[in-house]
Design a protein with these regions (language model features):
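A short, N-terminal "cap"/entry segment at the start of jelly-roll beta-barrel domains
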Residues: 1-38
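Short beta-strand His + acidic residue motifs that chelate non-heme Fe in jelly-roll/DSBH
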Residues: 51-53, 71-72, 88, 94-101
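Conserved short histidine dyad/triad with adjacent acidic residue
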Residues: 28, 40-56, 90
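Short acidic-glycine-tyrosine-enriched beta hairpin
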Residues: 75-90
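Short, conserved beta-strand element in jelly-roll/cupin
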Residues: 44-45, 56-71
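A short hydrophobic beta-strand segment most commonly corresponding to one strand
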Residues: 87, 101-115
Length: 115
């Protein structure tokens, strides 16, 4: 038996995340390590959509797979496009916004300790 996990994004359910300032955001968990909680997820943000402003103790690495993102980290803004990445240290308040006309698709890796 192989120890390799294959996860098909097309088979993962997306959950809408609304409230607390979030709108137009959907998340799909692709993998969560059962031992340390590290998580691999896919996010879709509709044009004009935004995630809620939040902070957590684990690092969050993000890769933009498509579209455009405006990322606010502790008040500092970054504009990212397809292929760009940003790593947000634990404890830093942040949120994402899609300023573009097409959906933003990003892949996020949440460090150990993520729920």
């Amino acid at each position: 038996m192989s120890e390799v996990d294959v996860v098909r994004a097309s088979e993962q359910p997306f959950k809408a995340v609304e409230g607390d300032g979030a709108r137009g955001l959907e998340l799909a968990r692709l993998y969560r390590d059962p031992e340390n909680g590290a998580t691999f997820q896919l996010a879709r943000v509709a044009p004009g959509g935004v995630s809620k402003r939040h902070a957590h103790e684990w690092v969050q690495a993000n890769w933009i797979a498509g579209g455009q993102a405006e990322v606010d980290v502790e008040g500092e803004k970054f504009i990212l496009g397809s292929g760009d990445s940003i790593v947000i240290p634990g404890g830093k308040a942040h949120h994402f916004r899609n300023p573009g006309q097409v959906p933003l698709v990003l892949v996020a890796v949440l460090g150990p300790g993520a729920p």
